A protein has these predicted regions:
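Juxtamembrane/interface segments at transmembrane-helix termini
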Residues: 55-74, 160-166, 208-225
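Hydrophobic alpha-helical transmembrane segments
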Residues: 32-48, 155-203
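Cytosolic/matrix-facing juxtamembrane and C-terminal tails of multi-pass cellular membrane proteins
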Residues: 1-3, 174-182, 186-190, 205-244
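Transmembrane alpha-helical segments and their cytosolic interface motifs
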Residues: 1-12, 119-166, 192-197
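Charge-rich cytosolic interhelical loops and cytosolic tails of multi-pass membrane proteins
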Residues: 62-130
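Long, highly hydrophobic alpha-helical transmembrane signal-anchor segments
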Residues: 11-75, 175, 179
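Hydrophobic core of alpha-helical transmembrane segments in multi-pass integral membrane proteins
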Residues: 15-20, 153, 198-207
Length: 244
């Protein structure tokens, strides 16, 4: 079909981003939804969601890589190589091509394994590859939702700040009356704004950390499954090599 399993990740994160854009900018709704033109509205939604999904995934992936580099001192290649080595050391590969690739570049060896699994005509191998592909989709979904979470936190701050500001001013006046001193309104608004921003940042940070952790788990599982599947179908079971 026109869309495959990998495109679903873009549509999911893109739909979330599209919904947030409509929430943040209500006038954008008229551009997306066209009265009495259902087919056109659906087509526009799919296209916009797909594009937004790609943008969200790229931004989320780069942010995850930056976090890993900043706090774990690991690049994306370092992370892949580490998982690759931890898994591959449990097997003895005999194929000359893959052993040479593993010695030269773990990332190239991984890509080669992925390609062989993808091109296999074995039904068992194809079923396993579909299963492995789901982890790529899940990872892309988690990474693609990072940007919407950031956008949502900013939107909530801007749209809900007047409410928090009024509550904050009332609280400051109450504290001032209770303690017998007065806080200037400007400083009160700054204090409430910083407190509100801190609360939203902490909540958003928790969700983003969860998304990054789940994305990393998907990468680990995907790399392990690719190596195990390749070894089983191309090293351990020679019958599958004859039909690829």
């Amino acid at each position: 079909g026109a869309l495959n399993i990998f495109d679903m990740s873009y549509l999911i994160s893109g739909t979330a981003m599209l919904g947030l854009l409509i929430y943040a900018f209500p006038e954008f709704k008229g551009f997306v939804f066209h009265k009495n033109q259902v087919i056109l509205s659906v087509a526009v939604c799919i296209i916009i969601a797909y594009v937004l999904g790609m943008i969200s995934w790229i931004a989320g992936k780069q942010f995850r890589c930056w976090i890993m580099k900043r706090f774990e001192n690991k690049s994306k290649d370092d992370y892949l190589n580490s998982t690759f080595e931890d898994t591959a050391k449990h097997f003895v590969f005999k194929n000359e091509t893959i052993t040479k690739l593993m010695a030269d570049s773990k990332s190239v060896a991984y890509s080669y394994m992925w390609m062989r699994l993808d091109k296999s005509q074995s039904e068992d191998c194809r079923n396993r590859f579909v299963y492995i592909s789901r982890f790529w989709v899940l990872r892309a979904i988690y990474e693609g939702l990072i940007l919407p979470v950031m956008f949502l936190s900013v939107t909530v701050f801007l749209r809900c700040y007047p409410v928090w500001n009024d509550l904050g001013e009332a609280f400051i006046q109450w504290i001032g009356g209770l303690c017998g001193f007065t806080i200037h309104p400007i400083f009160g608004k700054i204090l409430v704004g910083l407190l509100f921003a801190l609360i939203i940042s902490i909540i958003a940070g928790i969700f983003i950390k969860l998304l990054i952790d789940e994305a990393k788990k998907c990468i680990d599982t995907q790399v392990r499954e690719v190596i195990v599947a390749y070894y089983h179908f191309y090293e351990e079971d020679n019958t599958h090599q004859d039909i690829t």
